[in-house]
């Protein structure tokens, strides 16, 4: 049985998804499985036929135009796989095609988990933030640091809009507690109104149930590209500042008129 299951989501970004997949193949910890769900464009072109590693399964999302227009498709894909019964790992990680794991990511999460007697149900690591320039090079422009335990369960640090999905790792078993507590098997919200922080909602709900343990080591890079949906990032300091202010203002308006979903 694999130690770790990773869900990879692909939405027609051939260069970036290849780099994302390579970051999984390059892990120092070898006992993992991955399921790559592609929106269909690359899958139909047989783009992934080069992958021969039996640990990676590639499948189309099967999404319809109506679903793509009305739902958060990344969340929909996550939920579909989490409810499929096909994931066998004790720990679960998520990866979208903009982003990459550093080589020791899986080993670091797994070693922390085992060294703590397999008791932690959720962990988060530190992360680099990068901007991809027109030539394809990634410039590191900031970091998110895992400084202390997080989640309301331990009266810890906030997760929503502070921690990125790529920093987060949870056990498979915590999902049973999630279903019991929230009376749903829709773990990741599919509501498009929450698209700017759907991952944050999920992490906060997990953080209500268990301590989210910090791992200070930088294990991933969240890359902002021309196609990134989470923030219109720029390569200049002024551009980044304006984009951040815009995102915070939008979040403040949404919080004012809609109650927190966690």
What positions do the PLM features span?
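Nucleotide-sugar donor-binding/catalytic module of glycosyltransferases
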Residues: 1-262
